[in-house]
């Protein structure tokens, strides 16, 4: 997958929103690639800029609450999405039900949607490998509760000096800093290395502030 990855470099524009600017740059690359299927994750507001594409399947994935996102918060927004997208996928029935709040004929319209649960390979857990290690994996922002984790983990590590903690993730838009001799903070880490690290972790912390659908972090840590 990585060898086929193409990054979209953005230059700041005073005349376009970041979303419109991003999609415009994407469409330039897409014109050369000519994909059959275009997947959009958690950005329903991008759909309005793709309506002129022809002979392509458009699939929208919701990982979070649709009612909290620009482009799907209102009933009108969501009906437009249903009329302009080939398929809408949710990672939980909770987020699917949230999408259809206030929409009539939802049983008929649900045929255009599908719930695709998070998944991972089943592994045998070797508890002998477990260490006194606490992990936090994900975006290092307040929405994911990293500020709660950071303030709390310092107290825990002070009280239990034989325990250590490791943090994996980054967040360029919000800077939260925590320091402790037993706290190791890593940036972006390849997925296979994250899974290897989880083999040693005894406690994995997930402290999001909202009714987050069952995420992959919880699943893989278990």
What is the role of each PLM region?
Residues 40-45, 62:
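Short His-centered aromatic/hydrophobic patch
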Residues 199-213:
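Acidic donor-binding loop of glycosyltransferase active sites
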Residues 65-66, 94-95, 112-125, 172:
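Short beta-strand->alpha-helix junction loop in the catalytic core
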């Amino acid at each position: 997958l990585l060898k086929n990855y193409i990054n979209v470099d953005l230059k700041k524009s005073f005349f376009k929103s970041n979303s419109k600017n991003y999609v415009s740059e994407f469409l330039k690359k897409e014109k050369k690639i000519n994909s059959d299927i275009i997947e959009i994750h958690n950005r329903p507001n991008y759909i309005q800029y793709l309506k002129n594409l022809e002979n392509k399947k458009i699939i929208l994935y919701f990982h979070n609450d649709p009612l909290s996102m620009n482009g799907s918060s209102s009933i009108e927004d969501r009906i437009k999405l249903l009329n302009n997208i080939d398929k809408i996928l949710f990672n939980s029935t909770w987020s699917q039900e949230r999408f259809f709040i206030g929409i009539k004929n939802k049983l008929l319209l649900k045929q255009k949607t599908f719930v695709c649960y998070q998944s991972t390979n089943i592994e045998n857990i070797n508890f002998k490998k477990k260490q006194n290690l606490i992990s936090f994996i994900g975006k290092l922002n307040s929405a994911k509760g990293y500020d709660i984790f950071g303030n709390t983990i310092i107290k825990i590590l002070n009280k239990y000096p034989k325990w250590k903690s490791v943090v994996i993730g980054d967040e360029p838009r919000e800077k939260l800093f925590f320091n402790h001799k037993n706290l190791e903070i890593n940036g972006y880490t390849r997925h296979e290395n994250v899974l290897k690290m989880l083999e040693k972790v005894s406690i994995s912390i997930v402290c999001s502030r909202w009714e987050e659908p069952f995420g992959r972090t919880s699943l893989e840590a278990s």
